[in-house]
Structure formats: C-alpha cells, structure tokens
Amino acid sequence: MAGGLVYTVALTSCGRHDLLRRTLRSLVATLDLPPREIVVFEDGGDPGARAAAEGLDAPIRVILAEGRLGQMRAIDRLYAEIGTPWAFHCEDDWEFTRTGYVAESHALLAARPDVSTVSLRPIGELNPLIRDTPETVAGGVRCHLLDPARHPEYFSYTFNPGLRRLSDLHALGPLAAIGGEADVSLAFKRRGFRYAVLAEPAVRHVGWERHVDDPAGLSRPRTPWARWARSARKRFRRLRRRFSDDA
C-alpha cells in the first residue's frame, strides 16, 4: 500500500444514517493513503446503513449485527473482521476537514511505540486537564503527547477517530470483558501507553445532540442524579483499584 501502510477503516454505526453518510463522504474525500477497505458495523442491524454507503468511490463493506450489542461488543465484533496490522477507528458522527492525517499519524506512531493512537480532534475540545499540553514534534509531525498521570484512567486511549496498531488491541483480549472506554484506557495506561493529538486538527464532531444509548449500560448520564451516581461508582472503583494495587 502507499506509504508502506496497510490498514483498514473500522467504523461503528447505530441508526444515525444521515450522519453515517456525512461521515463516509468526508472520510472518502480526505483519506490521503488508501485503505484496504472500509468496514462499517451497524449495531442493531438496520439495513439503512447499506444505503448510506452506496455510490461512494471506496471499497466499503457493511456488516449488519443481529440485534443490539452495545459499543464494546460491537467494536470486538468489528475488529474480528479486520486482517490488516493497522486500523483507522471511526464512528458514525464525525466530519473530516482536511487531508494528510493518515500519513502524519503513521509517522508519529512509528516514531513513538508508547503512543496507542493519534487523535485528530482540536485539543481545545478535549478534557480541560490536558488542554495546556505543550506542542512538540514526533516523527516529524507536530502534535501534543498527553500525560497519562493527569487522570486515574484517561489519556492513554480513546475511540475517537484515529489510526492505531491492531497488535496493541489484540494484546488486551476482548474489550467488552474489560469494560467501557475509561477501563480500556486504564488497561493501556498500565501497559505504559499514552495517546497523541495532532496539532493541526482534521475532524469535527457532528453528533453532539444525537447520542445513542448503550444497552450494556455504558450510556452517558442525562440527569443530575444519574451523573452523581456515575461519579460515585467511578470513585468507588478507583478506591478498590488502589487498595488492590497496594495489597
């Protein structure tokens, strides 16, 4: 493949087919290195995902789930379909704004084996704890290398759009057995990883008001009580981990 990179675009979708079409159109228009294929996994099995992928100038394969699996099980199922050493992970609610980001991400990851993935989002949209991360250069690419020590779980992995090594994911085993995104990030943190953010953003989130609930119970809380309960659960888990690590 061009640039020495053999990769697959792995994209999860769940019923938001107008956003999926928008994501795919911008992605196909901006990919600077061609993937082996784009694999879309439609959680819930809605055939509208196939219509959203029609007519685009790219090798796109759509897989329809049998029922709802939830985010992490859907990701596990999707990645079981991928036979390339690299994957560009994506979801169905992003719009890509420039080209060049695949080659930049590959160069950065080749230079920094401690980086798990490369985010394309503006750093000003990310967690306030890391917005002041200084800009540096890795692999000839301007970027921000996040400090995992700034949070007990975050900043070592993200499922935001970005390139990643399949070997790092396979080393963890099934992600659904680990938990949610924060738990996966913690697993990467314990292996010495961080993630990086390109200094020049290449994507924007277009699904802010279109959140999809997760049947596995990992959905974002929407009421003050639900947010308080989630915060309490997180604090309890952190205390349990701390005592377990000290034992």
Regions found by a protein language model. Give the residues of each.
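Cell-envelope/extracellular polymer assembly enzymes that use nucleotide-activated donors
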Residues: 6-8, 37
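Short, well-formed alpha-helical segments that are part of the catalytic scaffolds
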Residues: 16-31
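C-terminal catalytic/acceptor-binding lobe
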Residues: 22, 154-157, 161-167, 171-247
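A conserved acidic beta->alpha catalytic loop
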Residues: 42-50
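Glycine-rich, basic loop-to-helix element that forms the pyrophosphate-binding segment
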Residues: 66-82
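Short beta-strand-to-loop acidic/aromatic patch adjacent to the donor-nucleotide binding site
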Residues: 85-95
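Conserved donor-nucleotide/metal-binding helix-loop-beta segment in metal-dependent transferases, i.e.
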Residues: 99-117
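Short beta-strand-to-loop element that shapes/binds the nucleotide-sugar donor at the catalytic cleft/hinge
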Residues: 118-132
